[in-house]
């Protein structure tokens, strides 16, 4: 009987200890604190995203690592400065800043342009109505647009206007839309963006588009204040369009603007005499255009690649601090992809577009390095947030326990020296050792709580991951 009574008392005591222990834990740390720490630990395993950071997509794990279906190791070929890689602009949508979209034919720009007007989380979303080609993208509280693109302002500087046309046209166009009072304000910021595509598949896509009757005759090709003459820019076909042309016919025309289109549209044509081919040799002309296109691409606020939709979305969001509503999707079922092209034909297309091939390799390298740089920057920020949460938790625990983590000794007046017995001296020495051990344990705990503070971040190139 006594045994059962003792057992009952012990069980009741244990239950009371557990009950009061739970109350103490809830008092020390609120539920949100523990959730934050748990989520921080979990996010570090899923790509070092801090609590509250939104994953770009609903998939588990890293949504970027294998979007293109290949897990090859990316090795940077070009050396870029931190200024080239760091892309985070202070875009004031409520101010006067404008995003200008340079739309190159057959690069997926139509899809991206629709994302800009229909898929961005905004305080004042663009107003798009069925049957209308353009959307109204006004700033909050103003009747002033923040976006210059096909689907917002239309082809206001010409059909598929290039870099040369846009940089000379957009500022004056925006000023003409404003009142006289607003024209006196300081000049606004124009953030140019574009999308590039693999040159071979872009070229095939343009051929198929022209084969179906597209001409782009409305393009102005304005340069240095004038239009090109027919001698400078002759046509590849005599009729109204080039519908039904074969790939061979498309390739043999020496005046075909599809050749190296991306390089030409991103370069400053004024540097080479616009479309006057007699100013310099062809190789010298294209070499200058390539360097100009590379320079403009580096200085653009943002550019994306059709082959990397999710990374394109991520870099745009990272650059402008804007978020898309729905994730981008990688669609490979284009008309160009359905064309069966012999290896020899592909080689000829690459030769015809050798400057675009060089530009795309350069752009791809810069794009992936920017992505890697942004991801590591995001991880550093998430790590700092975890450190701050850990410090807050430590401070709350110490505040409740009423300790500082370190022993504090106050000087006291020593008593007169008296002869001490060996036993008393030995006991005093043991007390001193226990005090030192306790202080050391407190310092170890302090160091453990701040172990992340002393870590050194390796250069991002030394830790290149499997991105492509």
Swiss-Prot record:
Binding locations of substrate: 133-134, 150, 155, 160, 209, 216
Phenotype on disruption: Morpholino knockdown results in defects in the branching morphogenesis of the caudal vein and defects in somite specification with impaired muscle differentiation.
Catalytic site positions: 160 (proton acceptor)
Pfam family, one: Sulfotransfer_2
Entry's Gene Ontology cellular component terms: membrane
Biased composition (Acidic residues): 438-447
Major place of residence: membrane
Lumenal side: 31-468
Cytoplasmic side: 1-9
Residues with glycosylation annotation: 79, 276, 332
Topology within the bilayer: Single-pass type II membrane protein
A Gene Ontology molecular function term of the record: heparan sulfate 6-sulfotransferase activity
GO biological process, one term: embryonic eye morphogenesis
Segments for region (Disordered): 409-447
Location within or outside the cell: Membrane
Catalytic reaction equation(s): alpha-D-glucosaminyl-[heparan sulfate](n) + 3'-phosphoadenylyl sulfate = 6-sulfo-alpha-D-glucosaminyl-[heparan sulfate](n) + adenosine 3',5'-bisphosphate + H(+)
Family as reported in the entry's similarity comment: Belongs to the sulfotransferase 6 family.
PANTHER family tied to this protein: HEPARAN SULFATE 6-O-SULFOTRANSFERASE 3, HEPARAN-SULFATE 6-O-SULFOTRANSFERASE 2
Protein known as: Heparan-sulfate 6-O-sulfotransferase 2
Species: Danio rerio (Zebrafish)
Lineage: Eukaryota, Metazoa, Chordata, Craniata, Vertebrata
Primary gene name: hs6st2
């Amino acid at each position: 009987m006594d045994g059962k009574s003792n057992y009952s008392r012990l069980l009741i005591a244990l239950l009371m200890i557990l009950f009061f222990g739970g109350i103490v834990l809830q008092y020390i740390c609120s539920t949100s604190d523990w959730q934050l720490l748990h989520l921080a630990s979990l996010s570090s395993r899923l790509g070092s995203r801090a609590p509250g950071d939104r994953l770009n997509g609903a998939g588990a794990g890293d949504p970027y690592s294998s979007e293109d279906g290949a897990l090859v190791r990316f090795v940077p070929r070009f050396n870029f400065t931190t200024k080239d890689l760091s892309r985070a602009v202070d875009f004031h949508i409520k101010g006067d800043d404008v995003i200008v979209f340079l739309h190159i034919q057959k690069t997926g720009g139509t899809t991206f342009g629709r994302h800009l007007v229909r898929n961005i989380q905004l305080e004042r979303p663009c107003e798009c109505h069925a049957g209308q080609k353009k959307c109204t993208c006004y700033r909050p509280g103003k009747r002033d647009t923040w976006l210059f693109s096909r689907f917002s302002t239309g082809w206001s500087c010409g059909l598929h206007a290039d870099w040369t046309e846009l940089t000379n046209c957009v500022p004056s166009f925006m000023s003409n839309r404003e009142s006289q009072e607003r024209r006196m304000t300081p000049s606004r910021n124009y953030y140019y963006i574009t999308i590039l595509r693999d040159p071979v598949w872009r070229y095939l896509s343009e051929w198929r588009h022209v084969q179906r009757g597209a001409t782009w005759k409305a393009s102005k090709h304005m340069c240095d204040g004038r239009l090109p003459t027919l001698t400078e820019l002759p046509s590849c076909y005599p009729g109204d369009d080039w519908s039904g042309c074969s790939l061979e016919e498309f390739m043999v025309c020496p005046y075909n603007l599809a050749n190296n289109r991306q390089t030409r549209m991103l370069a400053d044509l004024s540097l080479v005499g616009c479309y006057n081919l007699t100013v310099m040799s062809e190789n010298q002309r294209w070499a200058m255009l390539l360097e100009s296109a590379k320079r403009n691409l580096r200085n653009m606020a943002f550019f994306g690649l059709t082959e990397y939709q999710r990374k394109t979305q991520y870099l745009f969001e990272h650059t402008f601090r804007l978020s898309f509503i729905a994730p981008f999707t990688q669609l490979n079922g284009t008309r160009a992809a359905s064309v069966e092209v012999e290896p020899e034909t592909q080689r000829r297309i690459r030769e015809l577009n050798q400057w675009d091939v060089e530009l795309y390799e350069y752009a791809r390298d810069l794009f992936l390095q920017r992505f890697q740089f942004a991801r590591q920057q995001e991880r550093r920020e998430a790590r700092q947030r975890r450190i701050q949460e850990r410090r807050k938790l430590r401070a709350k625990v110490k505040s409740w326990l009423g300790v500082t983590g370190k022993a504090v000794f106050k000087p006291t007046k020593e008593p007169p020296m008296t002869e001490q017995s060996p036993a008393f001296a030995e006991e005093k020495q043991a007390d001193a050792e226990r005090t030192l051990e306790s202080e050391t344990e407190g310092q170890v705990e302090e160091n453990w709580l701040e172990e992340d503070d002393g870590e050194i971040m390796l250069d991002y190139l030394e830790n290149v991951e499997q991105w492509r």
